[in-house]
């Protein structure tokens, strides 16, 4: 089988105007970026508001492993399959970050014959949205220090500046820095640090904003510091929001591309689900729903992270509700959850599969807590055996009363996911609730919201909140932010805060190390265990295998 990039490069792509025509977008509403990528004009997006919305399909997964689950691949394959069976489907994805592309994960445009293309452009600079978000965030950082330098009229306490800097790269050396060294002309030295762009509150605001006006209003609510008498300082106080909105104006228009089979795909925004809320932009999701009968979207990492935040943050803020949920699993990953090392995953092991099944079972149970119909997509690998597939399907049927469907979209494209597509249509047309069940009520205390997630979804005995975090939570409550939802930042590899504790651990304690207010986005970030908002590169980063060949073509971007 050729590599992903070889498959993508061999494809004959349709002009982006032809893709737009399929979903009723006129040429005049497109801002082309070359022949195969375009942004959709703000005015056209606004003109769609009166149109009825289609059905929303959420794709999530089991807890990820190094064996890979293929959630984006399945999202693309399902969208292609829905179009193949006569449904009008639009795929809605997040934009990849450069950090993971050059780090451990590699590209994030799907795989095999279920990809969005042009994959090199999508995985790298794309339309410059991340540059715009990084620039807007950096402008805010510069304005804060500039305000202090020129007299500090707002009385900002430089010890309590919460606004860190960002860059779209995995770079552990930037986690903690000292800035403004070199003399008085460079400002007031203080401790600072960098996060990755996808963890920026600007990214979260970008993805949750309804339109340009809402974007600017949300930017203005962002709290960046405190005064010496402990009053909040916002970006509106610093008069930063107008210039930031100008930087983000064009970026806020969703990006239209295509799959290998010519299905329309909107790729827009890209917060991680382990350190942010993990969903593509509200604007793109709503646009997909108004342009198609079905909008197929994904939420990052496992259902304990991305799906929970999709429901408790994105749906709570917007009124969206999935008509069906797909949980992606692989036999390989389940066997790894059952204790098998990666090098042995190609060998049949029914006992390990049965042991690792508990991870899938908990994710299914958690999705059902949201009150949503669910189906399991078994992303097929060539090493899977019929006995293993039969075992998993029987476990799902007998223990969970859920259908598990073998999907071969990686090798066969949309044709390999038609059975899944028909099952999704049956679930969606069966009638899902207009509002999902949220994990916690809005008026619960912030600490109780964290505890409820930990005990209900993670199987934890309790939470342990460090004193610094407890003090900040109490202050957030006092300042009127107690009704905000919480955004859990923790390892994606486990229900616990220990990435090595696989399967479905119970009775553990979730350690809350810190909390951060995201008043503009409308949630409180809860930093658990050793999770970092600036990742580092692995010992052998993917960047080492990426290069240009003699003809100037990119190689190694898998």
Swiss-Prot record:
The keyword Nucleotide-binding applies. Its EC number is 6.3.4.3. Signal peptide: none annotated. ATP binds at residues 65-72. InterPro entries: Formate_THF_ligase, Formate_THF_ligase_CS, P-loop_NTPase. Pathway: One-carbon metabolism; tetrahydrofolate interconversion. It catalyses: (6S)-5,6,7,8-tetrahydrofolate + formate + ATP = (6R)-10-formyltetrahydrofolate + ADP + phosphate. CDD domains: FTHFS. One of its GO terms (molecular function) is formate-tetrahydrofolate ligase activity. Pfam families: FTHFS (PF01268). SUPFAM superfamilies: P-loop containing nucleoside triphosphate hydrolases (SSF52540). Keywords: ATP-binding, Ligase, Nucleotide-binding, One-carbon metabolism. One of its GO terms (biological process) is tetrahydrofolate interconversion. Belongs to the formate--tetrahydrofolate ligase family. HAMAP family: FTHFS. This is Formate--tetrahydrofolate ligase. It comes from Methylobacterium nodulans (strain LMG 21967 / CNCM I-2342 / ORS 2060).
